[in-house]
């Protein structure tokens, strides 16, 4: 097997061009077989096999800098840079990361996870190279979806203005393609940038005719992103006006064409943009047929493509409840930044196509767009992953909270997220939202309470409000028939107890409850509280606990710094209860890497055993006090 002889890009350079085709086939087979056992981002990587081989064949990594936007399509890059044998540990605890990781290899020159960052990083590296008078190439690979992000467009503007030697490879795959005819064929006549275009023209035209969905994709994006995006992707003129030499569109699976194009770009002065058309999931029929499903996948059967049946999740409960609420209240609309499937909003969009707004990878715009909707009496539900809400922080403060607008933040993937690791952990939403005036922050103990919080949010009249929920299966609790409006800022005492009160915020209630059950078998009976709200806190309850002499343990799956526990401590400090003993069980002040949620919780101490041990240490007998 030729692939087993490739342990470094220098090994790849010894291959003949015909051998590269053999390698491409072997790599696809390796990906399909390995990911069937580990799960991972299959479709994106099947789509960049030839492109990745060509990049490492033409350029000299790590001297030449290869940057992968988002990074989920870097598996082939990892295979070619000495990490093939680590793939059985992909995305597992202490195993191979699913994204570029500098500590893994000097060939990973930039760590990614969020989209649209590669071009800014490339510009920084190219500028540093020039200041240091070094000689190397900087190449950024970015998808057509990520290119719509404002940060990427800002970087294009800067690169073009400075005329830096940066090569941008636009990986135009089928993630957003609709099956109708578009204007890409006419686009070919406008390309004038390289000498190799004339001999490649007939081949490229044949490619486009053989993939009719490409034109449909551009038409679809033109419709979604109006004239600006049509101008961007249907015409190379804009890139050239920005200062780039534009090459393309080319077949991103034609090895010879890729090699020639990259060599041309390598010797072109100034910024270059190569527009490569690739097919997501190429080489595995199920992934080609449904690139959305196979973008990120769990384990599967290779022959059939069957995946294990998944249990109901908090996201699916959110999706069902959104439909119920929208049926009753026609002012409810949904906003998502390119995540309608992940956020569970596809059924909502099918039933209410004029009430779902997918604005693309544009979190800042999405947040202020929702604010604009709210000024006109609509009730926008901004469905966004916790990790991506970080990208709209100024808009959250300046455009939503400051104006006290009724925008509902449905914060999905809150807490530890497992295999996607540190770039996707939902650790910080509570901390960064808690300090914003006018904001209400909720977190349910289970899926039934999530539904009530969703009802509470749409009925709330006081400004912005949020609820956070995890990327986890539901608990399977009984669901109430009628949705209730919860009193703002009021906690729920689930079990009365003595000496110690456990205040649980959010879905970690299950862990706190397990700790209490364990302790009760030992005759220890702490109070168990479902906090429900981080802002406003239930101060009446907190002051009662202080007056009655309770020690307090707060439990949350979020940042220890600035989170729910910090809010409790601050509350006591403001009220003058300076002697209160409040211990925080949360995620410590470091980035938690990939693994299962169970393993991550064990690492950070978010377990029933850990909480129970904390409680025991606070009981009177542990302090040397004998109860009467």
From Swiss-Prot:
InterPro entries: Dxylulose-5-P_synthase, THDP-binding, Transketo_C/PFOR_II, Transketolase-like_Pyr-bd, Transketolase_BS, Transketolase_C, Transketolase_CS
Residues at which thiamine diphosphate binds: 72, 113-115, 145-146, 173, 284, 363
Catalytic activity: D-glyceraldehyde 3-phosphate + pyruvate + H(+) = 1-deoxy-D-xylulose 5-phosphate + CO2
PANTHER family associated with the record: 1-D-DEOXYXYLULOSE 5-PHOSPHATE SYNTHASE-RELATED, 1-DEOXY-D-XYLULOSE-5-PHOSPHATE SYNTHASE, CHLOROPLASTIC
Swiss-Prot/TrEMBL keywords: Isoprene biosynthesis, Magnesium, Metal-binding, Thiamine biosynthesis, Thiamine pyrophosphate, Transferase
GO biological process, one term: terpenoid biosynthetic process
Cofactor requirement: Mg(2+); thiamine diphosphate
Gene: dxs
Membrane-spanning intervals of the chain: none
Family from the record: Belongs to the transketolase family. DXPS subfamily.
Name by which UniProt lists this protein: 1-deoxy-D-xylulose-5-phosphate synthase
Cofactor note (record): Binds 1 Mg(2+) ion per subunit.
Subunit structure as annotated in this protein's UniProt entry: Homodimer.
EC number(s) on file: 2.2.1.7
Function, as annotated: Catalyzes the acyloin condensation reaction between C atoms 2 and 3 of pyruvate and glyceraldehyde 3-phosphate to yield 1-deoxy-D-xylulose-5-phosphate (DXP).
Pathway it works in: Metabolic intermediate biosynthesis; 1-deoxy-D-xylulose 5-phosphate biosynthesis; 1-deoxy-D-xylulose 5-phosphate from D-glyceraldehyde 3-phosphate and pyruvate: step 1/1
A single MF term (Gene Ontology): 1-deoxy-D-xylulose-5-phosphate synthase activity
Binding residues annotated for Mg(2+), in chain numbering: 144, 173
GO cellular component: cytosol
């Amino acid at each position: 097997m030729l692939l087993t002889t490739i342990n470094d890009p220098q090994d790849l350079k010894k291959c003949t061009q015909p051998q590269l085709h053999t390698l491409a086939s072997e790599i696809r087979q390796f990906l399909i077989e390995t990911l069937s056992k580990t799960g991972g981002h299959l479709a994106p990587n099947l789509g960049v096999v030839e492109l990745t081989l060509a990049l490492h064949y033409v350029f000299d990594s790590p001297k030449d800098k290869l940057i992968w936007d988002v990074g989920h399509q870097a598996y082939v890059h990892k295979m070619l840079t000495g990490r093939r044998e680590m793939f059985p540990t992909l995305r597992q605890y202490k195993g191979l990361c699913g994204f570029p990781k500098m500590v893994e290899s000097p060939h990973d020159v930039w760590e990614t996870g969020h989209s649209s960052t590669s071009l800014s990083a490339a510009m920084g590296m190219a500028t540093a190279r020039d200041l240091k008078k070094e000689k190397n190439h900087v190449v950024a690979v970015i998808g057509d979806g990520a290119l719509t992000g404002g940060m990427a467009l800002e970087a294009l503007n800067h690169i073009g203005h400075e005329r830096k030697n940066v090569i941008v490879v636009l990986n135009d795959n089928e993630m957003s393609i609709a099956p109708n005819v578009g204007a890409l064929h006419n686009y070919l006549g406008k390309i004038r940038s390289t000498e190799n275009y004339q001999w490649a023209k007939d081949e490229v035209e044949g490619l486009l005719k053989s993939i009719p969905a490409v034109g449909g994709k551009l038409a679809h994006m033109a419709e979604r992103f109006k004239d600006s995006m049509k101008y961007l992707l249907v015409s190379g003129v804009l890139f050239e006006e920005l200062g780039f030499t534009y090459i393309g569109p080319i077949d991103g699976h034609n090895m010879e064409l890729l090699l020639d194009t990259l060599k041309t770009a390598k010797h072109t002065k100034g910024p270059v943009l190569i527009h490569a058309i690739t097919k997501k999931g190429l080489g595995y029929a199920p992934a080609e047929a449904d690139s959305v499903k196979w973008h990120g996948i769990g384990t599967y059967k290779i022959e059939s493509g069957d995946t294990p049946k998944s249990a109901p999740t908090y996201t699916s409960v959110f999706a069902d409840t959104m439909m119920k609420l929208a049926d009753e209240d026609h002012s409810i609309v949904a906003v998502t930044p390119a995540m309608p499937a992940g956020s569970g909003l596809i059924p909502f969009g099918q039933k209410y196509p004029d009430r779902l707004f997918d604005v693309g990878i544009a979190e800042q715009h999405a947040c202020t767009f929702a604010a604009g909707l709210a000024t006109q009496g609509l009730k926008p539900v901004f469905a966004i992953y916790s990790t991506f809400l970080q990208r709209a922080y100024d808009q959250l403060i300046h455009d939503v909270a400051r104006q006290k607008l009724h925008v509902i933040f449905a914060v999905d993937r809150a807490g530890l997220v497992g295999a996607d690791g540190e770039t996707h952990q939902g650790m910080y939403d509570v901390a960064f939202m808690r300090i914003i005036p006018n904001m209400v922050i909720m977190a349910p103990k289970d899926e039934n309470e999530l539904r009530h919080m969703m009802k509470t949010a749409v009925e709330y009249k006081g400004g912005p409000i949020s609820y956070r929920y995890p990327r986890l299966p539901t608990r399977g609790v009984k669901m109430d028939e009628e949705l209730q409006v919860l009193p703002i800022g009021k906690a729920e005492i689930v079990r009365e107890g003595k000496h110690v009160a456990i205040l649980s915020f959010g879905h970690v209630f299950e862990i706190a409850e397990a700790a209490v059950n364990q302790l009760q078998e030992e005759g220890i009976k702490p109070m168990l509280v479902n906090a429900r709200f981080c802002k406003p806190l239930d101060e009446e309850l907190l002051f009662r606990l202080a007056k009655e002499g309770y020690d307090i343990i707060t439990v949350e799956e979020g940042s220890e710094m600035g989170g729910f526990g910090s809010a409790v401590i601050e509350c006591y400090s403001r009220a003058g209860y300076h002697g209160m003993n409040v211990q925080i069980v949360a995620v410590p002040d470091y980035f938690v890497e990939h693994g299962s949620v169970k393993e991550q919780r064990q690492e950070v101490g978010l377990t029933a055993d850990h909480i129970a041990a904390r409680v025991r240490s606070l009981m009177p007998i542990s302090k040397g006090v004998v109860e009467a």
